[in-house]
Amino acid sequence: MALAEKFNLQDRFLNHLRVNKIEVKVYLVNGFQTKGFIRSFDSYTVLLESGNQQSLIYKHAISTIIPSSYVMLMPKKQETAQEAETSENEGS
């Protein structure tokens, strides 16, 4: 399997939550809890939005992310096709 084809669970999970606008609860290592929608993420941070408030949270401070609905991660080819359908439907 080529390096580019490796299954990256964290990125695919966060991207699924972002694309499908699934609300999440985020628990931090200090016990603080917040909830909202993931707007963006990179290697080190997650941008969480709740109402008109944004929080840039460092990943090393996150203990757990709990989505409000079940997340089914599919093989990459199926997921890419589904995301393309979602994008087409949003444009309609």
UniProtKB/Swiss-Prot annotation:
Disulfide bonds: none annotated. InterPro entries: Hfq, LSM_dom_sf, Sm. GO terms for biological process: regulation of DNA-templated transcription; regulation of RNA stability; regulation of translation, ncRNA-mediated. One of its GO terms (molecular function) is RNA binding. GO terms for cellular component: cytosol. Residues 11-71 form the Sm domain. Keywords: RNA-binding, Stress response. Pfam families: Hfq. The keyword Acyltransferase does not apply. It comes from the Bacteria. Homohexamer. Belongs to the Hfq family. RNA chaperone that binds small regulatory RNA (sRNAs) and mRNAs to facilitate mRNA translational regulation in response to envelope stress, environmental stress and changes in metabolite concentrations. Also binds with high specificity to tRNAs. This is RNA-binding protein Hfq. It comes from Thermotoga maritima (strain ATCC 43589 / DSM 3109 / JCM 10099 / NBRC 100826 / MSB8).
